[in-house]
């Protein structure tokens, strides 16, 4: 078949598909504008936003946050909810664990008056509510907390001790098949918080696994492994927070396996000032000599906590350092997008 014949055959096939399934059911990827644009919601930790490679968690996708107990999973998810609301978006929280503290959520910055919350009785109800909210197209982010607490209805109606092999995994697999397409169509981000379990009898390799089967691992565009690696001491040697390390275990939108560290303080959640300090020191924007931190010709303070308080007071300095960090990151990245012609989408010769 010649090239003109192949082109005519393809055009006829496209015309039949659009007649059968509707206009827009098939199109060129380059002409599909939304394919090039990834809307994101900031996580509240600048170091994590940079590690994700796209500036936050993506809308229209599934994100899984997993880790051990008291590692900051709910705090991170609540910060994402708060940032979505600050952007003018609508957020929903499906609290299957019945453990969301509205006072802590408000302290972090979430608007609890506008935050929709559901505490369903069983897993099927929780996932159906999530799917209906996503289908409405009016919700920007949905948090499901947590996968381990999504109890199938038949298990709920049975006796304690009854064996239900693979019941939750089948429920998750069935729900995610429907949910994935709905999220992409309505540009809604679904965040699943998950717990970890130990595999019995594993001698080699990582014995840890997450609940709910393998479906969530496959359908997630981003998987965030969050761990507590230490405590932060305040006055009189009391703990005032935790040091957190995050690994991007899966990323379909940027290079995976990047890591980030940040502080979670008990009275404010993720410390944005702490992230600025860490990144500014790492990129030699702030000069650290001993316990003193200096910026240009100015002494910011002695000790990390003193500098943190200075940045919380001086918002102008905070935003200046944030801007310089972004400039440093952009300068260090390979400008691949700059080498692509905007109209022809062809790779151009790199500017010398």
Curated annotation (Swiss-Prot):
Subcellular location: Cytoplasm
Molecular function per GO: ATP binding; ATP hydrolysis activity; ATP-dependent DNA damage sensor activity; damaged DNA binding; single-stranded DNA binding
Keyword terms, alphabetized: ATP-binding, Cytoplasm, DNA damage, DNA recombination, DNA repair, DNA-binding, Nucleotide-binding, SOS response
GO biological process, one term: SOS response
Pfam families noted in UniProt: RecA, RecA_C
Binding site for ATP: 67-74
Domain of life: Bacteria
Protein name (database record): Protein RecA
Name of encoding gene: recA
């Amino acid at each position: 078949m010649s090239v003109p014949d192949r082109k005519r055959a393809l055009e006829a096939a496209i015309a039949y598909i659009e007649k059968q399934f509707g206009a827009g059911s098939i199109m060129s990827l380059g002409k599909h504008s939304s394919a090039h644009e990834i809307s994101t919601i900031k996580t509240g930790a600048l170091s994590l936003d940079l590690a994700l490679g796209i500036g936050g968690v993506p809308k229209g996708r599934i994100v899984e946050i997993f880790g051990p107990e008291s590692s900051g999973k709910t705090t991170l998810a609540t910060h994402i909810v708060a940032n979505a609301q600050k952007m003018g978006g609508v957020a929903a929280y499906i609290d299957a664990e019945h453990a969301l503290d509205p006072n802590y959520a408000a302290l972090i910055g979430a608007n609890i008056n506008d935050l929709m919350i559901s505490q369903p009785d069983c897993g099927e109800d929780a996932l159906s509510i999530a799917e209906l909210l996503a289908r409405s197209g009016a919700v920007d982010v949905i948090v499901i907390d947590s996968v381990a607490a999504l109890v199938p209805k038949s298990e709920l109606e049975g006796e304690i001790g009854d064996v239900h092999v693979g019941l939750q995994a089948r429920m998750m697999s069935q729900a995610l098949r429907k949910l994935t397409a709905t999220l992409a169509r309505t540009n809604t981000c679904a965040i699943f918080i998950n717990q970890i379990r130990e595999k019995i009898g594993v001698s080699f390799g990582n014995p840890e696994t997450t609940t709910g089967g393998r479906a969530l691992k496959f359908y997630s565009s981003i998987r965030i492994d969050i761990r507590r690696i230490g405590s932060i001491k305040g006055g009189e040697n009391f703990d005032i927070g935790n040091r957190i390390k995050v690994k991007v275990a899966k990323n379909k939108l940027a290079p995976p396996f990047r890591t980030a560290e940040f502080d979670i303080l008990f009275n404010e959640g993720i410390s944005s000032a702490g992230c600025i300090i860490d990144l500014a020191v790492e990129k030699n924007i702030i000069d650290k000599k001993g316990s003193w931190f200096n910026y240009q010709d100015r002494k910011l303070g002695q000790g990390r906590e003193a500098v943190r308080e200075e940045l919380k007071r001086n918002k102008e300095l905070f935003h200046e350092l944030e801007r310089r960090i972004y400039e440093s990151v952009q300068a260090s990245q390979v400008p691949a997008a700059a080498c692509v012609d905007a109209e022809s989408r062809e790779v151009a010769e790199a500017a010398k």
